[in-house]
Amino acid sequence: MKFRRSGRLVDLTNYLLTHPHELIPLTFFSERYESAKSSISEDLTIIKQTFEQQGIGTLLTVPGAAGGVKYIPKMKQAEAEEFVQTLGQSLANPERILPGGYVYLTDILGKPSVLSKVGKLFASVFAEREIDVVMTVATKGIPLAYAAASYLNVPVVIVRKDNKVTEGSTVSINYVSGSSNRIQTMSLAKRSMKTGSNVLIIDDFMKAGGTINGMINLLDEFNANVAGIGVLVEAEGVDERLVDEYMSLLTLSTINMKEKSIEIQNGNFLRFFKDNLLKNGETES
């Protein structure tokens, strides 16, 4: 179908936004809009400039016969800081205190607007790690994993603590829960991922990191690689952390059960933003 340029720009933008991290040949757009590649290239230049100015992301152009254009979702550091600050204020409500030093997160994990921003933030930080799969453990981490995977355009695999007949043969391991020191079991369907996959692990809450450490050990059974670890909230003051390299959005500093108070601080996500800026030779925005 032949488009006017204004209509072509709208449709082209929408297509890119709904196909993140997908390399699309210019020939595809040229045939789709019945327009010359030179015209498509001009359109993409306009879209790239707008995406970068508005903090939507960027367009990566790959030259050559097998090349094309790829939309990479990005979140500006200033936007990430503002979002995490607002989220932290919401979680600092004393009514969220649960027995055992936990915080009620279910309502947060049910808000599409929050999940979308968390997913984009994770995807932005780990965009250059060539992620093949996002992994999480049932059940609270599932919405976060799908949110990140939607921006990375990769599948989600869910580790379970009980076997399900519908998943076929599984690989199971025993792991030690870091917070309770209890031996537990987790399993993953054998056909859930390819050997050698680069995996982004996502979870909602981390104390000592026993569950995440268990997922890392489970990945060894698939000869898969840990490409990154992202958690929504980590607990501070843990005697022994079983996971070293991870990104957290928020840190649960203290919970005073007697006085019904919570102290929430920013996690370490800013370090990852700054590392990416240094790696790419960019400046803060």
Swiss-Prot record:
Entry annotated with the keyword Nucleus: no
Residues given in the record as 5-phospho-alpha-D-ribose 1-diphosphate binding sites: 138-140, 160, 203-205, 207-208, 211
InterPro entries the UniProt entry points to: PRibTrfase_dom (IPR000836), PRTase-like (IPR029057), Pur/Pyrimidine_PRTase (IPR050118), PuR_N (IPR015265), PurR_Bsub (IPR010078), WH-like_DNA-bd_sf (IPR036388), WH_DNA-bd_sf (IPR036390)
CDD domains attached to this UniProt entry: PRTases_typeI
One GO MF term attached to the UniProt entry: DNA binding
Activity regulation field: The binding of PurR to DNA, and therefore the repressor activity, is influenced by interaction with the effector molecules 5-phosphoribosyl 1-pyrophosphate (PRPP) and (p)ppGpp. PRPP binds to PurR and reduces affinity of PurR for DNA, which inhibits the repressor activity and induces transcription of the target genes. On the contrary, (p)ppGpp enhances binding of PurR to DNA and repression of the transcription. PRPP and (p)ppGpp compete for PurR binding and allosteric control of transcription.
Disulphide bridges, residue numbers: none
Name of the protein: Purine biosynthesis transcriptional repressor PurR
Designated gene of the protein: purR
